[in-house]
């Protein structure tokens, strides 16, 4: 799936997180799968690598974030510090 307002040149997108699913890599490192929705009601998953204790994202609040996109793996980011609340 695609975030409708993703700008590939700037690597920026805005969205609203709906669900955060904490996971662990095979090596035991924490990461999140964040299920987000955009202004066209399209649901997309973002993998957030390098999550640290104390990191927090608020559900149902608008965010803008710098994201990487890969055709095979979809959207990802390296740390929650890339997420900026805009509301």
Q: Residue ranges of each PLM-predicted region?
A:
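Flexible loop/turn segments at secondary-structure boundaries
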Residues: 19-24, 43, 72-74
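Short nucleic-acid-contacting surface segments enriched for D/E, G, S/T with interspersed K/R
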Residues: 8-11, 50-66
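OB-fold nucleic-acid-binding modules
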Residues: 1-22, 85
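OB-fold/S1-family single-stranded nucleic acid-binding modules
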Residues: 68-87
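Beta-strand/loop nucleic-acid-binding surfaces
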Residues: 28-57
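Acidic surface patches and DE-rich sequence motifs
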Residues: 23-27, 38, 70
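Structured core elements
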Residues: 12-16, 33-35, 45-47, 64-66, ...
